[in-house]
Amino acid sequence: MCSLAAGNGQGAELGPEPLELSDSGDDAGWEDEDADAEPAQGRQHTPCLFCDRLFRSAEETFSHCKLEHQFNIDGMVHKHGLEFYGYIKLINFIRLKNPTVEYMNSIYNPVPWDKDEYLKPVLEDDLLLQFDVEDLYEPVSAPFTYPNGLSENTSAVEKLKLMEARALSAEAALARAREDLQKMKQFAQDFVMNVDVRTCSSTTTIADLQEDEDGVYFSSYGHYGIHEEMLKDKVRTESYRDFIYQNPHIFKDKVVLDVGCGTGILSMFAAKAGAKKVIAVDQSEILYQAMDIIRLNKLEDTIVLIKGKIEEVSLPVEKVDVIISEWMGYFLLFESMLDSVLYAKSKYLAKGGSVYPDICTISLVAVSDVSKHADRIAFWDDVYGFNMSCMKKAVIPEAVVEVVDHKTLISDPCDIKHIDCHTTSISDLEFSSDFTLRTTKTAMCTAVAGYFDIYFEKNCHNRVVFSTGPQSTKTHWKQTIFLLEKPFPVKAGEALKGKITVHKNKKDPRSLIVTLTLNSSTQTYSLQ
């Protein structure tokens, strides 16, 4: 949110006439006298962008802004390469948000006004919106023109345009460098200082999301359909049940916290296993159905239900002995619910307590499915006789969640991430990893698939493990597929070396950005 300026841009008093933008000579004086001769009620005035002064033209306004506020509209337009619509959005953004000049001058790409909502005029008959922004790209004075049509400063203008283009490119490169530098600083700080999970910047990404920002996520879990799908996933639900029922010593007479309890199935398993008290927390509307379910099963004396985010609610106890949660998303980390579990661990888990599941791994495997690749990518080359190949740029960067036929696998799997929920921190959930895929077939590599495995191990008399991989029983998580823009041939026995980087989307920290490098090619994917 930008800081607010002192003025609101809606003043009514016309100040002294400022200097003109350009030196128009003696003619300017005659024009001013003519303007003064016009009836006062016929004049059209426009307010300054940063104070309540009124002016008769856009040029006067811009001159005032430059002299009095150190805001150069010419420089702003050239700095960001603004054309007609970009200029309109800029003016309306300033009118609507009232930012300070310091804030405006500090902006680098991407700009905050690049939204369609700023095409709507804030002021009726705003003279600044009637200004032709192309004038700012023209020479200030008209040069002498020779009979052949060439002007005396043609080369200078061309040089100026070239310099402006280079300046814009340098601005963009500088912005990227600053962003990279900030990431490096944060990484170094986390690595050296081992920042506590309650204070590191990644922690607050999810914890600090406001209700209007996170509403879609929680509302999606308010409908019974998604819970029905999860409950019917036997691999998932029976693994939790078997872990709890086959290891009752972990729950007997213990205080248990269920983070994101949904319908309360894990809480009821824990209660049946002998838990002294189960505290079940969920922000979604499904909690009201969970209350009825708990009463129907006569477990209300053991299970306490609390509606809200674990980062915001107050629990009836200071510490718990066990934390259970089914937090896994597509590619394990999608939706960033593990952040909330780690927050709960940091704040509520007693010394010597346990979090389940406790061990998780993410793996990659190479895929050869030429027909599937053609169906999604080559399809756009000829759509009813029309070339729509430009659509590939939108299709390829989206990771696909679907079941991979195990017959299409052409390599051994490779683990790229190992998570121990007892020791990991939120900053660890954004990572880079080198990997090697050893091919088992001679084929065309068309994609890389990702999946995860879950382990219930700590203090377990009966260890429970399940996999979401393509060679295991299908789960509702399926697999996450990263289609390659350019498939390439491989021979059995090859070692495909690559690198993967996973981090949260800054605009939506519950979604993921995945960058994959393989066969000397790099592609960035979104999972949202």
Curated annotation (Swiss-Prot):
The keyword tRNA-binding does not apply. GO terms for cellular component: cytoplasm; cytosol; nucleus. The gene is Prmt3. Its EC number is 2.1.1.319. Inhibited by N-ethylmaleimide and high concentrations of zinc chloride. It comes from Rattus norvegicus. The C2H2-type zinc-finger is responsible for substrate specificity. Residues 23-37 have a biased composition (Acidic residues). One of its GO terms (molecular function) is protein-arginine omega-N asymmetric methyltransferase activity. Residues 1-42 are annotated as: Disordered. Keywords: Acetylation, Cytoplasm, Metal-binding, Methyltransferase, Nucleus, Phosphoprotein, S-adenosyl-L-methionine, Transferase, Zinc, Zinc-finger. Its main location: cytoplasm. Ubiquitously expressed. It catalyses: L-arginyl-[protein] + S-adenosyl-L-methionine = N(omega)-methyl-L-arginyl-[protein] + S-adenosyl-L-homocysteine + H(+); L-arginyl-[protein] + 2 S-adenosyl-L-methionine = N(omega),N(omega)-dimethyl-L-arginyl-[protein] + 2 S-adenosyl-L-homocysteine + 2 H(+). This is Protein arginine N-methyltransferase 3. It is an enzyme of class 2 (transferase). InterPro entries: ANM3-like_C2H2_Zf, ANM3_Znf-C2H2, Arg_MeTrfase, PRMT_dom, SAM-dependent_MTases_sf, Znf_C2H2_sf. S-adenosyl-L-homocysteine binds at R236, G260, D282, S284, I310, E311. It comes from the Eukaryota.
